[in-house]
Amino acid sequence: MWKRLIPRRRNQSPVTESASKLDVTSQSEKRVDHRATDQTQTAQQNGTAIQAGRDVVVYGGMTYSDVKDAALGVFEANFYRLSSLARQTAEQRAEEVTEKLLERLLREHPEGFAQANDPGFQHALYTVQREHARTGDVNLGGLLVDLLVDRTRHPQRDIMQIVLDESLNTAPKLTEGQLAVLSVVFLFKYTQNQGIGNHQMLGSHMDRVLQPFAAKVQKNNAWYQHLEFTGCGTIGLGEIGLESILGTTYQGLFLKGFDPSEISARGITAGSEPRLFMSCLNDPSKIQVRTNSHETLESLFDQAAILTEDRQKIKGLFDETKMSESEIQAKCIELCPYMAHLFDVWSDSPMKNFTLTSVGIAIGHANIRKIAGEFANLAIWIN
């Protein structure tokens, strides 16, 4: 389960907003393509399937070929005239990114084909085609396709559609390193994976969604000024250390533990309630509070019907046994050596002061999903 976090400054109590549960498909669940031999027909609601060796899906009266022709027609009608060789390259790139988009829609959201003749969609599509034709950047093309597929899920003019349209125009103005900055800031300041229960799980999570960006971030002040200029975020006066963020979001992973005798010594009437206490992750000779954060601790209190007096005493144990920031940093680097570079850049750059806008969140989110695959729905943060 993922949860949206609201960024906070140092010494400010953490504030969170709950998000709906998300069922993420396991990485081990691979799609198998039987289309070459399987004659079973499928069609989405409002669609018609015609047998032709493989399915030819007609959605809203348009076949895949119809949609492709319409999509390429948008590019032909709008892209400026170039010399013969340059035009050939541009057309080839536009067709490549269009094919990627249509394949993604066919696989993930075929209802999106119904927007082929919508002016707003065509404008967004042309933005993707134009930027990929101009740069030929495969990574940028993949990011723009991700954003446009998301846009097809919002045919009505709502805040999500507006943010995604703006993101399509903004992403091409950024370097790969700046995209990495948005993803790293988004991951640390705006997300919490509530399924993480031990150090191994935290390490695996970071390897999947963070490691691909770690080496790309830099301290260059001009990067952050440009991100601010493009509307992806703001450089504020307040700052927060990466150790502080991790120590709040995943506090339960960074506890030193305490002797079991502390429970009776502090007069906690609930005793060694197994729903509240467990063996310490960092020192098996001790025990710790069984939670990652103050918010989940409150839920545990409610489930176990813990008395008000006991709650304050247990919170005291939770906070008093927390590692120092230097110890948290050392533990993270022990788990993931590439974190050393991130701690260094974060502490000595505007990253610690950077707050994302809705556009920065959308681009950072899409960049993570492009690399990691399955990820939480953007609607958790923008709605």
Show the residue positions of the predicted features.
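A compositional/structural signature marking long, glycine- and acidic/polar-rich segments
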Residues: 6-8, 24-25, 197-207
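Eukaryotic partner-binding/assembly regions in large regulatory complexes
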Residues: 49-51, 55-168
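Conserved aromatic-histidine-acidic binding/catalytic patches
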Residues: 132, 166, 170-174, 211-215
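Long, low-complexity intrinsically disordered regions enriched in small/polar
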Residues: 2-85
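Short alpha-helical segments that sit at the start of domains
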Residues: 157-196
